[in-house]
Each structure stands twice: as structure tokens, then as C-alpha cells.
Amino acid sequence: MVVKPVKLKNLTFDGRHIYVQSMLNTRADDIAGSVAQAVALEKAGCGIKRCSIPNESALELIQAIKASVSVPLVADIHFDYRLALAAAERGIDKIRINPGNIGSVDRVKAVADCCRKRGIPIRIGVNSGSLEKDILAKYGSPTPEALCESAMGHIKLLERFDFDDIVVSIKSSDVQRNIAAYRLMREMCPYPLHLGVTEAGTYNMGLIKSAIGIGSLLCDGIGETIRVSLTDDPVKEVKAGIDILKAIGKRGGVRLVSCPTCGRTKIDLIGLAKRVEETLADVDKDITVAVMGCIVNGPGEAKEADIGLAGGDGCAVIFKKDKIIGKYSEEEAFTALLAEIEKL
């Protein structure tokens, strides 16, 4: 299904570019801390930021953050539709609501009318933990069909009010259910999809669940924006999201290839690979770098890398594609590799 383009400030959700987003986890009344985190997220490559607006005083965040960063800001609104109206009046770029907990139809209409007049898109955010009681009773659990029925009901309500600048998310903490729901949703509507696995957990498990739940959908051509949800620093969410896009060829940058090591490895490859990864994290080059333990893996198995290093007995060779260009001691190899990367 062809995606209906939806504009968000200077961005367009149309499938041509996948935007990485995150959400502030500072207290809503901590203006200085929230601004500092927003700046850190933008520096890390976050394309869209979201903040909770739980009460009227939190509205002060909007102007403070927008004055400090350039990327779009999304207000996360629950229960009180008046906060959505006030956020729009203060210049918010996008609003995330669950129409099911905003209140009466008239209140949803008020939000839709306000956003339409200002060109503000709305994300319908449906989660497995907040489905309507009648839908849960119908399906017995938050099945993919239940999630999609809820989302479609909210979509039709906004469309009824002549509003179609819509982005949709239908998140579950169950990875397989999440994937099935998004695949079904893509068949049912043309609106841009915001991908994510909700309540994914702490860093290690959350990263694995998100890589599977988000990455598999992106490989199917599904999804226009992603958020990796982690019980951790939001900057890590952004870096994880960017790495997922790199891994499936949806984002440029340095891609590191390294072997798991074995009994043939005679250098500290694990330490070396970590140093290379950390050093190249912010390098703006669209290249693949291989760090391999022995000549079996590199340059042989890593011949498709633009440049790489293969360990020997206390030494290492550096190669471009499948050609060796130099041999160095283990101590010199790291610096020599960086020097060759700089030439690319």
C-alpha cells in the first residue's frame, strides 16, 4: 500500500527516509534538565523528540525546548484534551494522543479542529495495555486484530472531522504480536506508521526485542519512523535506532564488521574492536570496516569491507577490499587503521 505523505515541520513521512525518535525521561517540572536532555538527543542524531505534558505547568517545556533545538517536538497527551489545545497554541509540532482516553467525541473534534487549523499532525498511539474494554471483551486479549480495530476506530473518528494528517502506532510488548499487528495495519490503512516495541525493558533485552520487532518490519518495507524504547538513557535509544537502520542498509555511516574470535586469534581483538567502534561512532563516512581475528576471516571472509584489519601472531595486516596494503605490530595496528580510514 502506498503511504500517504504526512508533514511534520520540515520532515515528511513518506517512506523515503526513516526518522529515529526518542522521548525525554526527565521530570516535566525540570525545565533545565529537560532542555539539556533535548540538546543531547539532538546531538546524538535524534530526528524527532517527544515530551510528556501531564499538567498545565508542563506546557512551559514546549517553548524552552523549541528555543534550544531545531528538530520537531511532539507533545504526549493523555486524558485532558485541553492540554492538547494549549500545546498547539504554544507551537508544538505534533501531538500524540489516544482518542480513547481523551474523552467525549466533542473533545476529540476540538483537538482535530485545532490541529488542522495549525497544520499539526496527530499520532494515534494504541498500546496493548490500554485497549478499550469492549474490544478486549470481543477478542479476549490484545491480539493484532484487536490493536488494529482500536486504531481504525480512532482513525475513522479523526477522518469524520476532516482530519487526515495522521501517524499511527500500535505497540505491544510481545514481539511477535507487535510484528503481526503492524503488518495487518499496513494492509488496512495508508497512514505513516511509527514503529516500536512498547515496554521493551532494560538495555540488553530491550535492544534485542526492538531490533527484531522494528528491524523485521523495516525489512518488509513497513514503517516511516521508529522509537527504540529502553529503561535507560534516551540517548542510548537514539544510538540503537540508528544502528538498526545501519544494519539493514537504511542509514549510511560506518558499519563495523568483526569476528567472534576463536583459538586462532593471537591479538586482543575484543579490545581492539571496541576501540575502533568507539572511535568511529561519530565519523561521517558511509563505509564498512572489518576487524578480524585471523587471516581466515580477513581479508578472505571480509573482502567486501572497504577497509579492514586481520590479526596475526602479535601483529596485524590491513587490507582494502581483498588486498593487503600493510603489516603492523599489534601496538601500531589501531593507529595505522585509523590513518587509512581517514584517507577514504
Regions found by a protein language model. Name each.
Residues 126-127, 135-281:
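Catalytic alpha/beta core domains of metabolic enzymes, predominantly
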Residues 16-33, 52, 71-79, 135-148, ...:
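Active-site mouth loops of central-metabolism enzymes
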Residues 37, 41, 50-90:
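N-terminal active-site wall of soluble small-molecule enzyme domains
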Residues 56-77, 110-122, 182-193, 276-278:
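Alpha-helix-loop-beta-strand connector modules within alpha/beta enzyme cores
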Residues 25, 42-65, 96-104, 166-175:
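Glycine-rich, proline-tolerant flexible connector loops at the mouths of alpha/beta enzymes
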Residues 82-123:
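Hydrophobic or amphipathic alpha-helical targeting/insertion segments
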Residues 1-23, 28, 116, 278:
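N-terminal amphipathic alpha-helix/helix-capping segment at the start of soluble metabolic enzymes
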Residues 18-24, 49-51, 73-77, 95-97, ...:
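Hydrophobic faces of well-ordered beta-strands that scaffold small-molecule active sites
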